[in-house]
C-alpha cells in the first residue's frame, strides 16, 4: 500500500511540476541530436527544457525509438529536426505516435534546422545505391561546420521568439 501511495504521489508531483514549469513560460523542446539540443539550451537558457533523442555516440541515421521518445514528443512545444531526411528511418512513426499537432512538419512547433544553412554536396543526375552512401537532399551533417552553428542558433532564437513572444 505504501509503495502504491509513493508512486501515486510521484506521478502527481511530476504532473504538477510539468504543468507549473509550462505555465511559467518554459518551453519543452525536443531535438534529433545532442548538438541541436546544446544550441537550443544556449539560446533558450532557463526558458527551455530540452531533450535530445539521439545520443552523441549513436548514428543519427539509425536511432532505435523508445516509448519515452513518444512521451517527450507528445509533451513538446517545439521539435528541432536535423532535416534533409536524416531522420527518415525513425522520426515519422514518432511524430505520428506522439499525436501532437504542434510538432508536425509545417506546424508552428516544428523547426527544420537545415533550412537555415547552405547545404553542400547535393547530388545531381540519377542517384543509385551503386554510388554508395549518398544523401539525395544534400549532406545532412551541416551542423559540423562551425559557422553553421550561428545560423542554426539564429533560427532557434527566431522560433523561440515566435513561441514565447513576451520574452522576445
Model regions and ranges:
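Positively charged n-region of N-terminal signal peptides that target proteins for export
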Residues: 1-5
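Extracytoplasmic metal-acquisition and chelation regions
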Residues: 23-168
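Bacterial N-terminal signal peptides
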Residues: 6-18
